[in-house]
Amino acid sequence: MAIAVALLSLALLAVAMAWLRERHDATRLRRQLDTASEELQRLQQACARLAPAGVVDRLVADHVDEIGELPPQRKEVTALFADIVGYTAMSERLDAAVLARVLNGYFQRMSDAIHQHRGHVSTFLGDGILAYFGALQPNPWQSADAVRAALAMRAAIADYNRELARDGLPALGIGIGVHRGHGLAGLIGSRERMEYAFVGRTVNLAARVQSLTRTHGVDILVTDAVRSQLDPSFHLDAMPAERVKGIAEPVVTHAVRGRDAAPGTAPS
């Protein structure tokens, strides 16, 4: 009888130890899964700084690791191109560390204005910013959103210049060009490096229109393709047609003066 009790006790002890081991293993596995989930979240957040968050989410969800698995799609997109007026002269006057701080503040404020109006920043080009509206998701109001973003950028620069003045730094001026057209949107590049981009003459024309802001002495210019999508609340001035490099026909643009305010808000 004593032997049977002893054997039963040993069996129960073995079962208990096995249960404890399984519980320990389950707890350890749960910790490992939690750690892996946190690492994945951090990785996605880091990648979202290099590519639009919507693209990163799709890559993860679809397990895409080759460019060919997510081919570019033909889309109609509104492109916004902006850069700093007089950047070269400013970069020669300021210490490199100060210049970097000024640029970072500029990029952050401009990016915020773009994101708040359903756009996404594609890339920074020196002091330039290239952004798209309607590239990631269909957006019937993409052109109006782009112009609202440009007006928000104008206001943000005015606020930033007051801050720069308090620090004894020169004010920034910007020129913004906006154009709407067709092209291919998707992942472009090699196996080693790829980026989400929009390929087509739309981007080139947006950049050319931006350069015309200096010619016409204004800060925001849009093409006829954009103007045709805007409602009467936007106040525009037609500019003389100009020939630009790479475009066969003279380009007609419109300067954006502002926009009527929605009820209860200030005008742009």
PLM regions and their residue ranges:
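Regulatory cytosolic signal-relay segments
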Residues: 3-74
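Catalytic NTP-binding/metal-coordinating core of nucleotidyl cyclase/transferase enzymes
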Residues: 24-27, 31, 41, 66-148
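Alpha-helix/helix-capping structural signal
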Residues: 54, 85, 182-183, 225
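A generic structural signal for short hydrophobic patches within well-formed alpha-helices
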Residues: 56, 87, 130, 226-230
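Short amphipathic alpha-helical segments
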Residues: 60-61, 104, 108, 206-210
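Conserved, well-folded catalytic cores of nucleic-acid-processing
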Residues: 62, 153-156, 160-163, 191, ...
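Catalytic core of nucleotidyl cyclases, primarily class III adenylyl/guanylyl cyclases
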Residues: 82, 113-145, 159-203, 231, ...
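Cytosolic regulatory/linker segments at or just downstream of nucleotide-handling modules
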Residues: 183, 206, 213-268
